[in-house]
Amino acid sequence: MPFWWGRRNKFWYGRNYRRKKRRFPKRRKRRFYRRTKYRRPARRRRRRRRKVRRKKKTLIVRQWQPDSIVLCKIKGYDSIIWGAEGTQFQCSTHEMYEYTRQKYPGGGGFGVQLYSLEYLYDQWKLRNNIWTKTNQLKDLCRYLKCVMTFYRHQHIDFVIVYERQPPFEIDKLTYMKYHPYMLLQRKHKIILPSQTTNPRGKLKKKKTIKPPKQMLSKWFFQQQFAKYDLLLIAAAACSLRYPRIGCCNENRMITLYCLNTKFYQDTEWGTTKQAPHYFKPYATINKSMIFVSNYGGKKTEYNIGQWIETDIPGEGNLARYYRSISKEGGYFSPKILQAYQTKVKSVDYKPLPIVLGRYNPAIDDGKGNKIYLQTIMNGHWGLPQKTPDYIIEEVPLWLGFWGYYNYLKQTRTEAIFPLHMFVVQSKYIQTQQTETPNNFWAFIDNSFIQGKNPWDSVITYSEQKLWFPTVAWQLKTINAICESGPYVPKLDNQTYSTWELATHYSFHFKWGGPQISDQPVEDPGNKNKYDVPDTIKEALQIVNPAKNIAATMFHDWDYRRGCITSTAIKRMQQNLPTDSSLESDSDSEPAPKKKRLLPVLHDPQKKTEKINQCLLSLCEESTCQEQETEENILKLIQQQQQQQQKLKHNLLVLIKDLKVKQRLLQLQTGVLE
């Protein structure tokens, strides 16, 4: 029936209804009534419109399925966070494969992990997961979902979030978002209380996570899909029972041991100097100054100028410099830093080398705060001028130091830490000493003042020789500042001072490829028999998805009359990579060891560094101004040819990068090349 069937004019309604006749007092003659034959009323006229086939406003794009499809589940166990007391400010993802020093705590208080197919394959090589189906002879893949299971800890609570919106890049403010207090204020989060906090709760929580929001449900080549990020999991250890003050603490404030910037005016103690020069806190320091301290448990008076300038026969030109910064008696030795009195010819002289400050995190709103790296190679105290990544402004100290050390470690080289130290500017640090420093505070660990390494580790010979403040002797104080923040575990002087967030993941993929026909068949009667347990299953063979090239496989169209075509064999020979494990020994140097893949956030500067160099090289002009004589014409031609080859190489690099970005857009738009 048409759609207007229920709305049509119902002409039979009221057919048997007669109006009630009116009665008059006087009888009138009946009017002649002629009965007409009943006739069906005419149908309502409608304007007939011709049917026109119009185009659809939307179009459904379909993709042909591969001939062979198998469901693969990648199951494994992982630890998003693990660490110990003293590492709350660090990211455990960066410390995963680091070699921790003896007696040093490892790990971190939060973790940010990126999962991709390439990372899952790297974990399979480490025997950290299993693949239920092999991806051999399967060049296509589809990502379906991920099921994460989080297991509760005995004493430590956790806050977990996940993100499905790429890109996952890092800047100097990224890790602050993963502070436990910041995660608790998010709208969507997973709170995993410990067994002590919630004794009657379930021991685990399960969460099903969908694919990235802009990813299409279609088939992709494994080689292109392997390096793309699928999921970001971030978690932080927190304390729901003692959010702001620990169970064994008297108050929230912490004490900072800082270098007195009025005494240590020069910051060039890392620069070597030849005799007769050596490091001095300031240029006009009196050589006869005596430092009075209780070093070694008794009152001692130490004249450092006399000890440094006492030359020993046979010493080199750098002997005075190394004595001025040595642990035995330099300007940063315990004899100087523990001094409670300085005098010149029995007259008290100020300022003292160390100043104590008290930091109150409850009133710190970040206004006017600055955290920056100060060089120890030259100059005086001051803000960095050229590198904006070396400074953080307008952030509370307990939040600004959260993950900042690992950010510099990832984006810069680790060699910057022996040449710099952290300095803060904050009005929320107060002191009661009369010789107050300037507006900035160069803090150091108390163990450095006592002449010890952090966590009582062994002092090496180079450390005894170069005993001066660096970032390495500030980590305990940085952790104490971060511990003063809200909801950070405060486990100092406690027995249970470690944590670990154990997780189980199950990534669901579908592998697709050609249907393998014409498989070899042998006579079963000629098969050999050997003893083997029937219950043991043979392990699956897994191929690196990044090297699983579609052009190296035989498909149905590569067979003709039961034989492989010559075109298919030629295509495979051109695209088949050589396995480095099968190469013969040679006299050439071995290839450098490949760096382990870390599931960390991406640095956008490193991504574009090579491309920027190629673009700059295209704009370079030849600066050769030699006269064109017969002798140097050949040299000029060779230089021009080399420059053309370099330009050609840079253009190929740019085109390759453009194609990679186009393939990345295919994950979101589905546009084929």
UniProtKB/Swiss-Prot annotation:
Keyword Transmembrane: no
Main subcellular location: virion
Signal peptide: none
Any single Pfam family the record assigns to this protein: TT_ORF1
Chain segments carrying region Disordered: 575-595
GO CC, any one term: T=1 icosahedral viral capsid
Localization, UniProt: Virion
Keywords: Capsid protein, T=1 icosahedral capsid protein, Virion
Domain of life: Viruses
Keyword Ion transport: no
Family according to the record: Belongs to the anelloviridae capsid protein family.
Function: Self-assembles to form an icosahedral capsid with a T=1 symmetry, about 30 nm in diameter, and consisting of 60 capsid proteins. The capsid encapsulates the genomic DNA. Capsid protein is involved in attachment and entry into the host cell.
Protein name: Capsid protein
UniProt source species: Torque teno midi virus 1 (isolate MD1-073)
